[in-house]
Amino acid sequence: MTNIRKTHPLMKIVNSSFIDLPAPSNISSWWNFGSLLGICLIMQILTGLFLAMHYTSDTMTAFSSVTHICRDVNYGWLIRYLHANGASMFFICLFLHVGRGLYYGSYMYLETWNIGVLLLFAVMATAFMGYVLPWGQMSFWGATVITNLLSAIPYIGTNLVEWIWGGFSVDKATLTRFFAFHFILPFIVAALAGVHLLFLHETGSNNPSGLNSDTDKIPFHPYYTIKDILGALIMISMLSSLVLFSPDMXGDPDNXXXXNPLNTPPHIKPEWYFLFAXAILRSIPNKLGGVLALVLSILILMIIPLLHTAKQRSMMFRPMSQCMFWILVADLLTLTWIGGQPVEYPFVVIGXLASVIYFLIILFIMPITSMIENQLLKW
């Protein structure tokens, strides 16, 4: 008799995705981040659900409701800090996952890649709106500054901003709708992640060599289930250390004081995972130009498959491209650092240079490097 996991309508979906799935025998730990992102998402939804049970989305009570969660709710402090720092872990895993895709040419799976970019946008939107909810100083002013960017859109800009605000400033209506969107978006992310996996399983996983691995496949279970559990344990231990030893490390001290529309903080900056985007945004002195650069800095990922000029898929055997890739990583770290610095000399100059280098490497230097390597293959 055939095993029930292969016949039952629901269980056979699980079976073909997580148990009998044929996987390449040589995928490294860089392939762990998909499952880690899934764990992050589940954890964020669960902790978020318990936070929503005690949170009030009203300007008068939002800040004190978060205080109440931390002081009076059983293990509320733990849930709150798991949720806040869980977002940081989420983005660490996201950036490493995208970096892996860039390095090993996983972007050649077009549907999987494009849905991945869409997922990145959705998670960024969710994180931004979640940051506003505690209604601290930086929450309020972050929301004001970022929503205000939409006013740069010609003709409809101002109306659009007031429509999003639900008034003439960030206020009660804005907070309520942000809470509603922040609650619904993670479920949309979960659905998109399902489609992401669906398209991935049409082609099967890529592998470090970038070569076809159909001749050498192993079952996902037990090999990669145990590997994923190890990865999860490492991530959970890192998150636990962060939450239990320095929960406020990644937060902004301004958020320890409640929002005050009459008092602007000297340096408005987002959470660390948006600093690179903030640096690109303010590297252009024009408002609309900055907004376009900001959107394009992520949207550029969509055209990366078109810029692939190399004869090999992966960078494993392409030392020159590897060099450019790590320069790009260093450039993004530079942008992240600049995003957290005040707007003054020399940071403005460094930021603008790093922004130009970012787009130059992706649009021109990488494709040209690949073409040079193609010529070197003939030698």
From Swiss-Prot:
Cofactor dependence is on: heme b
Organism domain of life: Eukaryota
Where heme b b562 is bound, by residue? H83, H182
Q: Name one GO biological process term.
A: mitochondrial electron transport, ubiquinol to cytochrome c
How is the cofactor bound here? Binds 2 heme b groups non-covalently.
Record's GO cellular component terms: mitochondrial inner membrane; respiratory chain complex III
Q: What keywords tag this UniProt record?
A: Electron transport, Heme, Iron, Membrane, Metal-binding, Mitochondrion, Mitochondrion inner membrane, Respiratory chain, Transmembrane, Transmembrane helix, Transport, Ubiquinone
To which protein family does this belong?
Belongs to the cytochrome b family.
Assembly and partners?
A: The cytochrome bc1 complex contains 11 subunits: 3 respiratory subunits (MT-CYB, CYC1 and UQCRFS1), 2 core proteins (UQCRC1 and UQCRC2) and 6 low-molecular weight proteins (UQCRH/QCR6, UQCRB/QCR7, UQCRQ/QCR8, UQCR10/QCR9, UQCR11/QCR10 and a cleavage product of UQCRFS1). This cytochrome bc1 complex then forms a dimer.
Protein known as: Cytochrome b
Please name the source species.
Crocidura suaveolens gueldenstaedtii
